[in-house]
């Protein structure tokens, strides 16, 4: 009988948290991709998650793309991106732009900045930009 009570407590707690998770909405999380390669240089991006697949698109110098989404309980939210630039899009980098934590995040911002030397990240609008990835070169 004690095990049954513990089992019921766990089930009720789990479903109660699911309902509470949706009852109290929070600001959407954002992934920003910004082109700071230089004037006349185009940045190509392709980002996708488990539920969404953005088309391949280009950003001109000083343009940015904003992807807004909410974390989902049960499925870990993860956005992966491929950035390319250069002649024939020779330089590329593939990385995880956002991954949900163990608890839901509200209003998290991941600002990815593409520059000629590297790719930088600013978390939650806290400068300075921190180096994260280098560019790979295709043969």
Curated annotation (Swiss-Prot):
It comes from the Eukaryota. Keywords: Glycoprotein, Secreted, Self-incompatibility, Signal. GO terms for biological process: rejection of self pollen. Residues 1-20 form the signal peptide. InterPro entries: Self-incomp_S1. Pfam families: Self-incomp_S1. It is found in: Secreted. Glycans are attached at residue 136. One of its GO terms (cellular component) is extracellular region. The keyword Signal applies. Belongs to the plant self-incompatibility (S1) protein family. This is S-protein homolog 14. It comes from Arabidopsis thaliana. The lineage of its organism: Eukaryota, Viridiplantae, Streptophyta, Embryophyta, Tracheophyta.
